[in-house]
């Protein structure tokens, strides 16, 4: 495993990329309404990144992915491809965006409610949000990756939900996906020991039903096998000498956390 430790200069570039990614999710919030298509949301995000931020959308053509954002609606767990289907009141959607600025990546995702959400969908999204933060709050030098996963898994399962195991967080920097893999389940005191200067994502996917998932024939879209709702939140995190710094904070964090 090759884990990159970012220099002070590289950390500042990661901060900038992270802020830009968070700004995209703040910008798109007002457009997530009944009747809009995920294709339209994708176009708005793409144009904002390219024309306003003067940055690069990392997802577009990454390993063949055809769009700028991932839009995962209701029982879609992750990597949903924007299309021309209109969102309807009561839908829940995760929007996942990664921005490249000056060679460095900022990666974040957030849950949005289309109109007024059903109570059970709101509870799932909020539980996932709190689970992500439980994981992030363990991050400091000397913490092990298993501690992050254990904090997330314990909280999720206490709330009678399940953690998806096939997809995980990842190191990030000049390279979009680098070491280490950050699992959202695990045993405390196990796994790689965190060191100051590491940057990685924490991005739990939480299902209302069972944890099992299925990949659709498009090769990207992942759904819950039992068609239960799924939620995800994601931040890019820097390990500091004192603890951690979240590089992708946005308006939703200030509102919910």
Regions inferred by a protein language model and the residue ranges of each:
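Active-site neighborhoods and metal-handling regions in enzymes and metal-associated proteins
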Residues: 1-257
């Amino acid at each position: 495993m090759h884990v990159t430790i970012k220099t002070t200069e590289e950390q500042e570039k990661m901060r900038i990329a992270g802020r830009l990614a968070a700004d995209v999710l703040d910008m798109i919030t007002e457009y997530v309404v009944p009747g809009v298509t995920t294709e339209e949301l994708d176009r708005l995000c793409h144009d904002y990144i390219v024309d306003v931020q003067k940055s690069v959308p990392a997802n577009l053509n990454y390993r063949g992915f055809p769009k700028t954002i991932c839009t995962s609606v209701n029982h879609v767990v992750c990597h949903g491809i924007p299309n021309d289907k209109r969102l309807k009141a009561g839908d829940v959607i995760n929007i996942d965006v990664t921005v490249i600025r000056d060679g460095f990546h900022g990666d974040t995702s957030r849950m949005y409610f289309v109109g007024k959400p059903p109570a059970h969908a709101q509870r799932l999204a909020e539980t996932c949000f709190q689970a992500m933060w439980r994981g992030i709050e363990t991050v400091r030098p000397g913490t092990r990756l298993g501690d992050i996963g254990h904090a997330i898994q314990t909280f999720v399962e206490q709330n009678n939900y399940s953690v998806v195991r096939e997809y995980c967080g990842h190191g990030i920097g000049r390279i979009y996906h680098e070491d280490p893999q950050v699992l959202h389940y695990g045993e405390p005191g196990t796994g790689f020991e965190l060191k100051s200067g590491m940057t990685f994502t924490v991005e739990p996917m939480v299902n209302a039903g069972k944890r099992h998932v299925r990949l659709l024939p498009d090769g990207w879209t992942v759904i819950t096998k039992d068609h239960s709702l799924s939620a995800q939140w994601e931040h890019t995190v820097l390990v500091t000498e004192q603890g951690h710094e979240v590089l992708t904070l946005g308006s939703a964090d200030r509102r919910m956390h």
